[in-house]
Amino acid sequence: IIGAGGMGRTMYDMARESIGYGTQYDIHGFIDDNVAALDNFANYPPIIAPIQGYQPQEDEVFVCSIGGTSRQKCMEEIIGRGGKFLTMIHATARLGTNVQVGEGTIVGAFTSIGADAKVGKYNLIQSYTVVGHDSVIGNWNRIDTHVTLVGGTIVQDGTDIHTSAMISHNVTVESHSRV
């Protein structure tokens, strides 16, 4: 897990509750430039190394808990060193017929993605979010909790859609927007 802050600790719990845990992947630990990030916390796997300079092993897959503008940069560093990102879908998420979810995308607990929606690569879609039918989500987006994207919504690339936003039918959210 990249990042051992609050979202990283949340990602640890989510990873243990997601499809494939224990059969397709296990949690080895965190990488974080703040190697003391877990000093005041118990019951988490260790921070095994800083992010800077970390060399991914062939059998490792990653999820990234870092938000904001540094998320993409951090992930691209790991990808550039040969790292691969896990597509992680929480066991309680509901995916409709013909839904496509790209590599490295995280789908949180109790999230619903409607029929024929397409979700690109490296997105973070947090818990209790609704992505309506026929919606298209590009790459590198962060969609926070309790967001509703009604049917036919298009979210281009690199956007941040914050908690409880509601976006109506057939609206396009342009690249690098903040909602």
Protein language model regions, located:
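Glycine-rich adenosine-cofactor-binding loop
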Residues: I1-A15
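Short hydrophobic segments within beta-strands
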Residues: I1-I2, I31, S65
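Active-site catalytic pocket residues across diverse enzymes, especially alpha/beta-hydrolases
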Residues: A15-I19, I78
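NAD(P)-binding Rossmann-fold cofactor-contacting core
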Residues: S18-D39
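Conserved acidic residues
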Residues: H28, E60-V61, E103
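Phosphate-bearing ligand-interacting subdomains
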Residues: V35-R94
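Structural signal for interior beta-strand "rungs" in well-ordered beta-sheet cores
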Residues: T87-V179
